[in-house]
From Swiss-Prot:
Motif stretch (Prevents secretion from ER): 437-440
Residue spans of biased composition, Acidic residues class: 419-440
Record-given protein name: Protein disulfide-isomerase A6
Family to which this protein belongs: Belongs to the protein disulfide isomerase family.
Length: 440
């Protein structure tokens, strides 16, 4: 009965915090499916809050944000992104904490961070100030946009994430590089190129973050850099080509949306990337860094070395390495430890009750984990990871609500374990009569 009441309370709490905004508010709910259309392609000034429903600061900001949206209605657009649900949008704009507020002005691909007060009045003042600046820029002929003609591409945030290439810089940057390059050949007057620009810029940012710069997106003005256009037979715009070290360039014939481009880039990355490292948990830095820098970290707790020997342990590690390679496109972190070596970690993840080996996958951002309940085999682990990759499977909060303490220890030396040597006790001076008296 207590569990039922607790479950109802939890559900009520979840519904409350997940509904910070509704369709009846003047705050426009933004998602990956409408963000580009509503914000990036809009001529309006936008204030966008990136929030998480469980965030206390976000909950306190909500009434003030609604108040500002009502006051600015038909003057400035006010939106909100559930960045906990739509992590791709948050990642695209470098959101690392909640709430984060960004102002999308003339240059939609280079929003400014809002650092003002959290009251409705302060938000409105900042919006009107940004609006005045936008109007002044337009009067002065400075659109600041990514698509502002022949020079517009180089003046936007794409200058950082979309690499502008020329006849002089192409070979050094692309052909001499170990990285994978996706290069768009465009003409400034081309309508299809203009439509592609925001998608290409958004994809460049996401790909850069997800591949750690190993896949790069670039652009070449083919009307200016005619040597390159001739070399690669560019006859229509836009033309996108993929360049990989030691291979002939191939045409990209996929979709023109951000998600299509990112998906292809990640495929290229996984095809060329080495398998992720499988690290032993020997200190807190390794454990926390691996989990905090990846969407998920997979933690395996293997039997004690005395139970398996080096051969048995290595067979487990081989299975883990094989699966790490199979799922490398996910860019998860991979960790392992020995049973009993990290008691607090095991306790926080509820590991040990089913015996060893055991496995859990941790989302350090949400402090939740999923536990492998099937067999610790290649097939069993693969089914577990496949469910996780589709966002399925049951999860639970990490015990204690924070990352558990890690006990420093020496790394495994790759050898069989040895039983501790018992000290020989000299009993020659001990009289048996005395022992009998002690026992009594």
């Amino acid at each position: 009965m207590a569990r039922l009441v607790l479950g109802l309370v939890s559900c009520t709490f979840f519904l409350a915090v997940s509904a910070l905004y509704s369709s009846s508010d003047d705050v426009i709910e933004l998602t990956p499916s409408n963000f580009n259309r509503e914000v990036i392609q809009s001529d309006s000034l936008w204030l966008v809050e990136f929030y998480a429903p469980w965030c206390g600061h976000c909950q306190r900001l909500t009434p003030e944000w609604k108040k500002a949206a009502s006051a600015l209605k038909d003057v400035v657009k006010v939106g909100a992104v559930n960045a906990d649900k739509h992590q791709s949008l948050g990642g695209q704009y470098g959101v690392q904490g909640f709430p984060t507020i960004k102002i999308f002005g003339a240059n939609k691909n280079k929003p400014e961070d809002y650092q003002g007060g959290r009251t409705g009045e302060a938000i409105v003042d900042a919006a009107l100030s940004a609006l005045r600046q936008l109007v002044k820029d337009r009067l002065g002929g400075r659109s600041g946009g990514y698509s502002s003609g022949k020079q517009g591409r180089g003046d936007s945030s794409s200058k950082k994430d979309v690499v502008e290439l020329t006849d002089d810089t192409f070979d050094k940057n692309v052909l001499d590089s170990e990285d994978v390059w996706m290069v768009e050949f465009y003409a400034p007057w081309c309508g299809h190129c203009k439509n592609l620009e925001p998608e290409w810029a958004a994809a460049a940012t996401e790909v850069k973050e997800q591949t750690k710069g190993k896949v790069k997106l670039a652009a070449v003005d083919a009307t200016v850099n005619q040597v390159l256009a001739s070399r690669y037979g560019i006859k229509g715009f836009p033309t996108i080509k993929i360049f990989q070290k030691g291979e002939s360039p191939v045409d990209y014939d996929g979709g023109r949306t951000r998600s299509d481009i990112v998906s292809r880039a990640l495929d290229l990355f996984s095809d060329n990337a080495p398998p992720p490292e499988l690290l032993e948990i020997i200190n807190e830095d390794i454990a926390k860094k691996t989990c905090e820098e990846h969407q998920l970290c997979v933690v395996a707790v293997l039997p004690h070395i005395l139970d398996t020997g080096a051969t048995g342990r290595n067979s487990y590690l081989e299975v883990l390495l094989k699966l790490a390679d199979k799922y490398k496109k996910k860019m998860w972190g991979w960790l392992w430890t020995e049973a009993g070596a990290q008691y607090e970690l095991e306790n926080a993840l509820g590991i040990g009750g089913f015996g060893y080996p055991a496995m859990a996958a941790i989302n350090a951002r949400k402090m939740k984990f999923a536990l492998l309940k099937g067999s610790f085999s290649e097939q069993g682990i693969n089914e577990f990871l496949r469910e996780l990759s589709f966002g399925r499977g049951s999860t639970a909060p990490v015990g204690g609500g924070s990352f558990p303490n890690i006990t420093p220890r020496e790394p495994w030396d790759g050898k069989d374990g040895e039983l501790p040597v018992e000290d020989d006790i000299d009993l020659s001076d001990v009289e048996l009569d005395d022992l009998e008296k002690d026992e009594l």
